[in-house]
Structures are given as structure tokens and as C-alpha cells.
Amino acid sequence: MIASHLLSPLIFLEQQPAYSSVVIGALVVCLVCLVWPTESAKRAPPAPNFGVPRIGDAAAFLADPVSFVQKATQKCGSIFQIKLLVANLVYLRGVKLNRMYTDVKEDTWSFGGGIGLFLRKIAKPGYFDHLRTLVNSLNRGVNRKAALEHYFQLIEEEAGKALQGWSQRGAVPVFEETSRFVHRVIVRCLMGQDFYDHRLDELYEILHHMEADIGHPFNLLLPDWIPHPAARRLEQNRDRFAQIFEQQVADRRRNPEIWRDSLDYISFTLEDPRTAHLEGYLPSHHTVLMFAAHTSTVASISWTILELLRNPDYLAQLRQSLAAHPDARKCPELLAGIKETGRHYSGVHMFRTTHRAVELEGGKYLVPPNWIVSISPYLTHHDPEIFHTPQHWIPERWLQPDDRMQNLNNPREAAFLQFGAGCHRCPGEALAGIIAQGLLATLVRRYDMVWGKEGPPTDLTALDFSKVGSPWLEGDASIAIRPKVAE
């Protein structure tokens, strides 16, 4: 959560004496900038002003972002600002403003800038200047029909191997083991068989080391030119990933005939004239993709497994439907279950950074450049005026939708935001979908599953939003699976 990252430096100062004077100086400059009156401040959206002046809103946002945004909406309406320690954030609430938010062009409000708030430290300087070109290449490279068909075969193969291993271990932590499965699929499909055969484990270590440091408060508080341990570790892991990438690409070029018809995404970007000249940024691109494709896909699969255990009637219905649909990608009950998980367990915030001033409410409010603008997929998905009984996982809502439900994910509504909306949909939607479909279909078809020895989690509302993407369950949950007995 951005609030925690921007505020928590205060509690680290005594533990980081070598950086205290630098941090304090930066804070003073930032606070002066925040309180200095400007013309745009006269047209700024209202702030809820909870608690202690200047820091009360930020502290409340840090402590419980969902509750804060709900209370701020009640007090201020659908547009309000949150004065964070080193940034100003404007929050937009409601389907109408969601639609406007997703339709604003990238050169005005930047999704790339929002991603960069968290991931700029793991990318080579200059990478985000080419983000649009590289993201567009995902549609051409990953979403090719031949590529997706090939990827699904690999996914089913990896699912079979992963689940066989789960079945031999008694009980496994769902999120942790799903994380390993998703990583194997991402490396094999997007990077290629050579990365999978020779670099899989080291890449997983790099991913987790980066996850541990990416949210360090100094990475968000301090300018890039001020060194500190977390930034140095990120730089070391970033450079190691680049070394691995360059070594594997060099090996490929010594044996080009092997890779001539390869469907992996690295091969595509190296050969496509629109991206080949950006080879120096491709290591950063694939580092960012590891984060973007990993966290939310793990959440989608893991939460669906837990909800199927909690809803045995739907699990039985899903088994029957999978028996009637040899291609899991066409199984309505499976697609509905995954979609409902995407609604129920979505990320709290979506961020964009502003490059140009934008007026809201007919000029009543002005959002200036260099601010952050946010909407909440989580609160949109839990709005009872949009979704009936939103606090419950009910995949049937997608199987027999009324007219309102059928329109939720079109540009006019922007009420279902798992993969964005309007002209800003996630280009990895298809791949994330087949990864989830492949593992879940294999699990339900071939295995029976029960809770681990600890039983079901005592609190499935203990959501961990600390990662970049959809929440995981705090403390994880264990399950045991065993092969189904042939009938």
C-alpha cells in the first residue's frame, strides 16, 4: 500500500542513523512544498482532515486504507485528496469517475508512472520512457493464437508436475506452492526453455529478494541518487538479472537455428523490429513482467482453491461441468469461479501519475501535474449498489447475469476492474487466465482436496495487500490433495 511505504520511514530513522540527517532534510523540503500555497491549491479537492492536522489523513490511510477511503467518501463525496508525506493523491469514487479515469490518455495520466512508483528501482534508467512500446509488444507477442495454444500445453504439463508433488507431501501451503508453479510457467512461456532449464531457481531467488526490498520506505522517499542498502541490493539483483539475460541471449545467437521458430516472448522481442532496438531494456522489461504476472495470478489461483473448499456444492458442479468440457478454457463454471475471485479478492488501489493538469466536475477541481490519482477496484467490487451481496463469493452471479451484470465490464460501466477497463486493459489478461484455468482444471479433475491438519483458516478476511497486485492471505493456508479414485 502506498501510504505505508510513504509514511513508515519515520519509524526507521533511529534504526538507520547514517541516513537520518538525509531523510530529515528531505522531509523538511517535502513538507515545505506541501504547505506552500499555490494557485492549484485553491481548486484542490477537499481533504477529510481526520485526526492530527497535516498527518492525520496519511496516518489513517496507512492504518486501514479501505476504511479510510469509505469514511472519506462519506465526508467529502466522490472526489477528495489525501496529503501524504511526500506526495498529494486525489481519490476518485464511483463508476462514472472510474470510467473517466480509465479513459484518460497515457500522456495525461500515466499508468506507467503508477507502476514506476513501486518498480522504478528494478528497471534500468530510461526503461519507463519506452514502456508503451514494450507493453504493446505483449499483445503482438504473447497474445498470438499459436503462442497461447503452446503456452496452454506447457501450463497443463507444469500443473501436472506441480500437483503430483503436492499430493506426495501430505499438506502444502497454497499461496507459497502456487507461487512456485506460476514462476515456473512465467519463465518457461515468456523467457523460454533455456531460462527454465538453467536459470529457474536463481530467477526465483532474485524475484523474492526484490520483493523483500522493493517496498522499503527509502526507495520511495529518497531520490534515486541517494544510496542506501535496500537500493544497492535492488541494483545488484537487477544487474544480476541483466547478466543472466545477456548470457542466455548470447548462447542463443551461437545456435540460432534452435530458436528460429520459438514462441517464447524473449525471442519475439529480439526479432520484432519495433522492439529489437530496445534490447538493452529487455532485461528490465522481463523483471517488471515477473512482478506484474506473478502476484495477482498466484492470488487468483490460491483464493479460488480456498473458496472451492469452502463451497463444496459449487466444487461438485464444477467437476460435472469440466467432465462435459474437455477444453477447460471453455468451461463456464471454471471461468465464473475465477472471475468471481477476481472481483472478491482484488487490489485496493489503482494508481496513475499526472503529467498534465485535468479539471474535474466542470472545472470545480483541478488536479495538477506531478500528483497521483487513484481509484479503488476493491471498493468498487464490494459496492452493494453494483454487486448483490458483494461480501460473499458467488460465482453463479456470472453464470446467469442480468442486464446490469452483462454491462459491468464494458467501457460505459468500468465497474469490474480485475484487468482494467476501457482503453487500458491489461495485455496479460489472456495469459493470466489460462495459467489459472490450467492448474485449477487439473486439480479438480484429478484430485480430491481437504484442509491441512490445521483446518480452514480462522480469518479469510486477513488480506495481505503488501505486494504489488491482488492480496494474498496473511499466514497462508494449507491443503492436502490425493489422486481421485477411478469410478
UniProtKB/Swiss-Prot annotation:
Positions annotated to bind heme: C426
Chain ranges passing through the membrane: 17-37
EC number, UniProt record: 1.14.14.-
GO molecular function: heme binding; iron ion binding; monooxygenase activity; oxidoreductase activity, acting on paired donors, with incorporation or reduction of molecular oxygen
Membrane topology, from the record: Single-pass membrane protein
Pathway connected to this protein: Secondary metabolite biosynthesis
Name of one Pfam family that matches: p450
Required co-factors: heme
Xref: PROSITE patterns: CYTOCHROME_P450
Keywords tagged on the record: Heme, Iron, Membrane, Metal-binding, Monooxygenase, Oxidoreductase, Transmembrane, Transmembrane helix
Cellular localisation: Membrane
EC class: oxidoreductase
Superkingdom per UniProt: Eukaryota
Main localization, broad class: membrane
GO CC annotations on file: membrane
SUPFAM superfamilies: Cytochrome P450 (SSF48264)
Entry annotated with the keyword Iron: yes
Protein role: The subsequent chain release by Dieckmann condensation (DKC) could be catalyzed by the TE domain present at the C-terminus of pyvA and/or the alpha/beta hydrolase pyvD, installing the tetramic acid moiety.
Family membership: Belongs to the cytochrome P450 family.
Protein's name according to its UniProt entry: Cytochrome P450 monooxygenase pyvB
Source organism of the structure: Aspergillus violaceofuscus (strain CBS 115571)
Lineage: Eukaryota, Fungi, Dikarya, Ascomycota, Pezizomycotina
